[in-house]
Amino acid sequence: MADETDRHFDVQEKIRKYEEFLDQRLAKDLEAVFKSQDEIVAKITEYTQLKSSIEQIQKTDLKGKDLRSRVDLGCNFFCQASVPDPSRIFIAVGYGFFVEFTLSEALNFIEKKLAHLQHSVDKLGKDAAKIKAHMKLVLGGLQELQGLNQLSHRMHYPV
């Protein structure tokens, strides 16, 4: 009888550890992957909008003319701006650094950056799939342990 009670407590302890691993580790890892993926998708959107704006500037052919535009100062607060030479553009490349590009150089940079960001999103998608597979595996283990636990109760206490 004591041996059966010990086995029951061992199973309950294993169930608790599996549930803890599922909640504390796998679920948080999956949440972090989704958050990173969302941040990268936001960057992709920004670079795509920038690419579209540069292409529009190239189409209008503003050689020798000022470009008038609205600039977002933050929190969707805009002001009017006048750009005396719209043939060059500064792009934030990370870590607080800006690089001056010609419009064609900027488009080339953006294409490479978009490819890199898309690769990162794809990798994070694969990471999320792996974490989900691990979660499924742990859930299967939990179901098996709980099934064994219920089976042992049925064996000792017939209905």
From Swiss-Prot:
Membrane-spanning intervals of the chain: none
Cited Pfam families: Prefoldin (PF02996)
GO CC annotation, single: mediator complex
GO molecular function: transcription corepressor activity
A single GO BP: negative regulation of transcription by RNA polymerase II
InterPro entries tied to this protein: Prefoldin, Prefoldin_subunit_alpha, UXT
Family: Belongs to the UXT family.
UniProt protein name: Protein UXT homolog
Organism: Nematostella vectensis
Source taxonomy: Eukaryota, Metazoa, Cnidaria, Anthozoa, Hexacorallia
